């Protein structure tokens, strides 16, 4: 197999190269950029100023991931139809309706020269490699461009910023289901009456649950703002919502993750069916990512601090994240980052380390704008009819007619939905609006921080709802729930839209001092799996996302608390244990045991529960690579599905009942598209089976007047009938299908980022990070102040030559990932030199 890096060095820059000695590195000229790749193809960039450093970064990204990045750019800006045709017109329209390009450009124009050098240098580096590709496409043009029939376009700073805006801000900090919630509330009021309907809504979508596990322990602090969902004043002010719920209009995807391009009616049917089967974990679900544990000096063994991160973005080919080392201009860092952002989301600089998980704070509100019946395009605000902002957008369509449409915007934000029957337009207001580029650069600048104070200064500038984590060489650890959050009016129910007439406009933004944070917690560790950051902190408004007594973070807490101290290897092994852990066994086994305790030993329902009792909840593959060694998850899947049908689903009017029917286990033949979580229906059911122990008022009896035991046993009877017909009467012989894991060739938007044949599979689904990394400070087993590892599957590269030759680093981390392995991350010049596979030297004048 050809080594593309060696090919590049020999064919493109041989005249620029000379032997790299360490003294020469220190004395390199201001125009020089050195690119050194390690044995896994991960590049380290050396330059003396910011522009040259990020020029080198953009240059290597283009070498490795040019097609992936081209499709990410088109996906985030809504220009996919231009190269892939009419099936992507609706997708492009949806993308363009969701952002305001002039606002992003204005932020870029306001940057300091130093910060502008980051984006400009990166774009210039991308373009430099594209220019070389254009001079030698027979060798250097990635095959995917020929497969799909177009060529790469040049980059500008706007494109670099929009990759971040579209894949981080708009994916992980833009989720809202307030209009969906209003549709649900409308149906609940029709079924139960106004007062009781609101009470049932509170049972299904509570705002705060005091029993929810928190990343910051109660003894450390509680969230100071109190929310009373019984004091909602805005619900009564809203019009009915009888249109289809907006969640049904999200573009449907197939099992391969590709957009299906369906008619509106068929799309809604597909989304409803997919969500009913897979819930938030499935094809029609929402991101439910990621996990992290940080162990400080009082709990780490043979080290002062250990950080293990597992961001769960989903699995893709090429890899979702990109490994890079940056050295010079005040930077000295190593790690990896999604879509090759110019700021490392996961990494360290030899003194501190950092990582992230999605925060799921509520930083987005929907304002119901009252439209003028006489003046189209006008809405009522502060007693006056105000003209909306608008812009015309034209979608260029490959082999088709261009389509022009209008994007509308009010003082609150872009218009997402219009209900002509009530003369209402729904505008999305983001607390981070206007702070997108500053948020990106906060990630970039944190790479220079050397202590908690410097690091939190950047955390304060990061406006998206993202959890940030910290560790340092002295064994200090910390956590901040970053983001900008609205200071809402009293009586504003953040789960629902509010009138946009002016009275309910935000008072401003809450100060950063209000953000949940902790430094060196008493427990000696920090753990998160997208759970609540702090007691009394309000959850996201997403109907599919709840913080309650049932939470998967308990699986991490339990493992960390089992040992007084953990070594680095033990901390890494938590990945293996949690990735195979059934998430419902711990929650419902006591209920099942209580219900069957009076049954005879021969009763098959008791046999099912005894099988669960003997099981540790860990799913392991049989030798056939297709089935589980234990049938526990299959039993829980069928039982939970039956229980939900008899309880939560029965209590919710159609079509919203489909939101709560998924057990959380069902998936496609290719496996889940992302992280597995406890389903929203299961979380609601868990509160119900707790009875008086639950802090959530049970406005409607989910057991419909029957004893809880009777319903549990009936669901167990369903389970036995279903599984015994399928596998026979001997439970010990049941071999139930395992979940697979697929690295899909379509990005999370559903847009191709590779050819279909680049899809990669592994037999075992692992509920773990898309990448995993571990950083260990002051290890006693080494004379280095820090040791670091990661695994970025399938591999560093995404390059396939025009003749079909696959780069040697395309999938050389696939088996490593499957076996819970890891590779070293190098930082020092000596280590990079010792593990050098190839080298390239550029001389570039600015």
From Swiss-Prot:
The keyword Hydrolase applies. Changing residue 290 to C: Loss of activity. Binds 1 Ca(2+) ion per dimer. Ca(2+) binds at residues 178, 362, 364-365, 494, 541. GO terms for biological process: antibiotic biosynthetic process; response to antibiotic. It catalyses: a penicillin + H2O = 6-aminopenicillanate + a carboxylate. GO terms for cellular component: periplasmic space. Residues 1-26 form the signal peptide. CDD domains: Ntn_PGA. Its EC number is 3.5.1.11. InterPro entries: Ntn_hydrolases_N (IPR029055), Pen/GL7ACA/AHL_acylase (IPR014395), Penicillin_amidase_A-knob (IPR043147), Penicillin_amidase_dom1 (IPR023343), Penicillin_amidase_N_B-knob (IPR043146), PGA_C (IPR033813), S45 (IPR002692). One of its GO terms (molecular function) is metal ion binding. It holds the Pfam family Penicil_amidase. Its cofactor is Ca(2+). Keywords: Antibiotic resistance, Calcium, Hydrolase, Metal-binding, Periplasm, Signal, Zymogen. This is Penicillin G acylase. It comes from Escherichia coli. The gene is pac.
């Amino acid at each position: 197999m050809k080594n593309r890096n060696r090919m590049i060095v020999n064919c493109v820059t041989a005249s620029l190269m000379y032997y790299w000695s360490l003294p020469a590195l220190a004395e390199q000229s201001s125009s020089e950029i050195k690119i050194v790749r390690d044995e896994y193809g991960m590049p380290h960039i050396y330059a003396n100023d910011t522009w040259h450093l990020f020029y080198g970064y953009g240059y290597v990204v283009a070498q490795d991931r040019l097609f992936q990045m081209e499709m990410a750019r088109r996906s985030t800006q809504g220009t996919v139809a231009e190269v892939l045709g009419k099936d992507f017109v609706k997708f492009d329209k949806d993308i363009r309706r969701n952002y305001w390009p002039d606002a992003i450009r204005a932020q870029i124009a306001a940057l300091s020269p130093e910060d502008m050098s980051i984006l400009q240098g990166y774009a210039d580096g991308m373009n430099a490699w594209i220019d070389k590709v254009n001079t030698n496409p027979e060798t250097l043009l990635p095959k995917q461009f020929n497969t799909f029939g177009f060529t790469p376009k040049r980059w500008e700073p706007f494109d670099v910023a929009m990759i971040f805006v579209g894949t981080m801000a708009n994916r992980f900090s833009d989720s809202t289901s307030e209009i969906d919630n209003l549709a649900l509330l409308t149906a609940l009021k029709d079924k139960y009456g106004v007062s009781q309907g609101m009470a049932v809504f509170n049972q299904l979508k509570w705002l705060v649950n005091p029993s929810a596990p928190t990343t910051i322990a109660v003894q450390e602090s509680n969230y100071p703002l109190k929310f009373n969902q019984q004091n909602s004043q805005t619900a009564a002010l809203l019009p009915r919502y009888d249109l289809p719920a907006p969640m049904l209009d999200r573009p449907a995807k197939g099992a391969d993750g590709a957009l299906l391009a369906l008619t509106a009616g068929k799309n809604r049917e597909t989304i409803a069916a997919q969500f009913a089967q897979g819930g938030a974990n499935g094809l029609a679900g929402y991101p439910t990512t990621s996990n992290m544990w940080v162990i400080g000096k009082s709990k780490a063994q043979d080290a002062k601090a250990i950080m293990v991160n597992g961001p769960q973005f989903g699995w893709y080919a090429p890899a979702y994240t990109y490994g890079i080392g940056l050295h010079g201009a005040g930077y000295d860092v190593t790690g990896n980052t999604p879509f090759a952002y110019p700021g490392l989301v996961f990494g360290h600089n030899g003194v501190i380390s950092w990582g992230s998980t999605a925060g799921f704070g509520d930083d987005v509100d929907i304002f119901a704008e009252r439209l003028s019946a006489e003046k189209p395009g006008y809405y009522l605000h502060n007693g006056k009819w105000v003209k909306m902002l608008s812009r015309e957008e034209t979608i260029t369509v490959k082999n088709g007619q261009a389509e022009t449409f209008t994007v509308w915007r009010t003082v609150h934000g872009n218009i997402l939905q219009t209900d002509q029957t009530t003369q209402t337009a729904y505008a999305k207001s983001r607390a981070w609006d206007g702070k997108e580029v500053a948020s990106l650069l906060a990630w970039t600048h944190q790479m220079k921080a050397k202590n908690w104070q410097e690091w939190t200064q950047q955390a304060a500038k990061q406006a998206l709802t993202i959890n940030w984590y910290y560790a340092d060489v002295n064994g200090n650890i910390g956590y901040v729930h970053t983001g900008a959050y609205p200071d809402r009016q009293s009586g504003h129910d953040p789960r629902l839209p509010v009138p946009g007439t002016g009275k309910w406009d935000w008072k401003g933004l809450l100060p950063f001092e209000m953000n949940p944070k902790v430094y060196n917690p008493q427990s000696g560790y920090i753990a998160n799996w997208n759970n609540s950051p702090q007691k009394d902190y309000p959850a996201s408004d997403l109907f599919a996302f709840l913080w309650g007594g049932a939470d998967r973070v308990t699986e991490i807490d339990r493992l960390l608390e089992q040992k007084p101290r953990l070594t680095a290897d033990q901390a890494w092994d938590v990945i293996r244990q949690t990735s195979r852990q059934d998430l419902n066994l711990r929650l419902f086994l006591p209920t099942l045991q209580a219900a069957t305790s009076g049954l005879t030993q021969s009763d098959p329902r008791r046999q099912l529960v005894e099988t669960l009792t003997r099981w540790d909840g860990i799913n392991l593959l049989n030798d056939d690579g297709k089935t589980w060694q234990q049938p526990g998850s299959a039993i829980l899947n069928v039982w939970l599905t039956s229980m939900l049908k008899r309880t939560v689903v029965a209590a919710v009017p159609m079509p919203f009942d489909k939101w709560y029917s998924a057990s959380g286990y069902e998936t496609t033949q290719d496996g889940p598209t992302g992280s597995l979580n406890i389903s929203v229906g299961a979380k609601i059911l868990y509160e119900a089976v707790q009875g008086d122990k639950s802090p959530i008022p049970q406005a409607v009896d989910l057991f419909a007047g029957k004893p809880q035991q009777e319903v549990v046993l009936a669901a167990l009877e369903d389970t036995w009938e279903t599984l015994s017909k399928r596998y026979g009467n001997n439970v010990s012989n049941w071999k139930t299908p395992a979940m697979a894991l697929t690295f899909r060739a379509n990005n999370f938007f559903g847009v191709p980022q590779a050819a279909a044949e680049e899809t990669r599979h592994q037999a075992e689904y692992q509920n773990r990070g898309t990448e995993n990394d571990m950083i260990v400070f002051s290890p006693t087993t080494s004379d280095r102040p820090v040791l670091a590892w990661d695994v970025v599957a399938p591999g560093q590269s995404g390059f396939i030559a025009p003749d079909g030759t696959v780069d040697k680093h395309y999938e050389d981390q696939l088996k490593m990932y499957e076996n819970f392995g890891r590779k070293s991350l190098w930082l020092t010049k000596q280590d990079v030199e010792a593990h050098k596979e190839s080298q390239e030297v550029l001389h570039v004048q600015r």
